[in-house]
Amino acid sequence: MASEFVVVFAVYPRVTQLDFTGPHEVLSRLPGARCVLASVQGGELEADGGLVFAHVRRLADVERCDLLCVPGGFGTIEAMEDAALLAEHRRLAASARYVTSVCT
């Protein structure tokens, strides 16, 4: 049995849902994969089309990841100015094997 491979999708308000759900569909099928949806605040998060993701974890509560994925979206500019989000990206990326983004 393969060891656990933690995939973290670091999302933010107005993320494009397809930029998250498309890669999730593929990466969740990796042997031993455990996908985590996380944001700075956790809880619920609204994507750019109004779709609401529930039970989003707080990035600060995620200890580590093997792959960090940052989806694109209409909230990208605001996300790039969010010091807390960028700090969590840096923290998780420091020990991740892969750091990826989608579209943006």
Q: Where do the PLM segments sit?
A:
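Extended, subdomain-level signal for the structured scaffold at the beginning of enzyme domains
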Residues: M1-V99
